[in-house]
Amino acid sequence: MNFKYIVAVSFLIASAYARSEENDEQSLSQRDVLEEESLREIRGIGAKILGGVKTALKGALKELASTYVNGKRTAEDHEVMKRLEAVMRDLDSLDYPEEAAERETRGFNQEEIANLFTKKEKRILGPVISTIGGVLGGLLKNLG
């Protein structure tokens, strides 16, 4: 009789262990799904914030450009306009990264393309901020 109890208890333990393993796998996959959904939400919020900043920045740059167009332009003003146009092109390439990447990366292999994207992000943000600072400083200098 002891043998029957040992077999029955062993079977119960094995089935309980199998159920716990299955539950662990399900909870891990559910956790992965929840983490992925959280990341998507965070990326969505970041994209909305970045979109708002880009829109505001574009509006400010267009206003600055129209100010320079209406007045007399010196060589320095002409350089500032060129920089503003370059910044506007870079901002437009942020809005449509696939098209810009397609134009810039024809003939590159995948690793070079990945490196180009990270370099482009760094290349765009630095000059955009410095150009905007320079333009605003120049405007304040001219107004003051």
Curated annotation (Swiss-Prot):
It holds the Pfam family Bombinin. Expressed by the skin glands. The modification Leucine amide is found at L143. The keyword Magnesium does not apply. The modification Asparagine amide is found at N70. Its main location: secreted. InterPro entries: Bombinin. It comes from the Eukaryota. It is found in: Secreted. Residues 19-43, 74-123 form a propeptide. Residues 1-18 form the signal peptide. GO terms for cellular component: extracellular region. One of its GO terms (biological process) is defense response to bacterium. Keywords: Amidation, Amphibian defense peptide, Antibiotic, Antimicrobial, Cleavage on pair of basic residues, Cytolysis, Fungicide, Hemolysis, Secreted, Signal. Belongs to the bombinin family. Maximin-7 shows antimicrobial activity against bacteria and against the fungus C.albicans. It has little hemolytic activity. This is Maximins 7/H1. It comes from Bombina maxima (Giant fire-bellied toad).
